[in-house]
Amino acid sequence: MTAGVAGNMAFNGLMQLGRGQQPTARDLLLPPGNIRRIAAQLARMRGAAMKIGQLMSMDTGDMLPPELADIMARLRADADFMPPKQLQGVLNDAWGVGWRKQFAGFDVRPMAAASIGQVHKARLPDGRELAIKVQYPGVARSIDSDVTNVGRLIQLSGLAPPGFDLGPYLDEARAQLHQEADYERESTYLTRFFELLGHEADFAVPEMVPELTTKNVLAMTFVPGMNIEDVAHAPQEVRDRAAERLIALMLRERFGFEVMQTDPNFANYRY
């Protein structure tokens, strides 16, 4: 991941030295060419590296140049798709070779791809539309090494503030990512939230489809909606209503349900 970035840094450094300037590692990393390289590499890695890129775009966006924040923001919902042959193999392992017979329709083109897996739309014979999340092969095994590689890139680039101890942050990232890769655990919490909120008018929670859910495939009913970030461009009353509901939900989770959805990725919310 660092080879192309390092080459571009070296070239830019020589150019600046030729102009009598004294470049820093951070200055050399931030030109748009390097930013695009980093974003593209993170998207292709499909695992912990891309997840950390997502967190960078949300958690440190105000501390980074707009160019870096904007490009990293693409990682919130976009990534390289799994090749069709690889997808077929994963679903054969999860559901058996004749899995297509269970569906009235299954779109092999993913609706979205993110850090841990990609999502496909499907339809059951009874008419229910589903969202099927398929985990990338080997992603759980690559978490530790990917987090280490991204940590090295952050240190090389000088993106971390002076004196900032990156180690505990990376340790926590590893722990959380291993939890996210556990789809059976996620299905348990999704079922719990459906029990708590699934029948309320103010919220729409997908319902689990347990007969199609495995350790690396998560099946749920499809709930249409717009990106929550697009609400920023809606009329004021719509923005107020969305904010009120989100704040009320957070308070109910903390003081009523005693269980919270703590992944801050905005791609997890629709309106």
Kindly label every feature range from the protein language model:
Residues V259-F266:
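Catalytic-loop of the protein kinase fold
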Residues M1-E253, E258, R270-Y271:
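Broad phosphate/nucleotide-binding scaffolds in NTP-utilizing and phosphate-metabolizing enzymes
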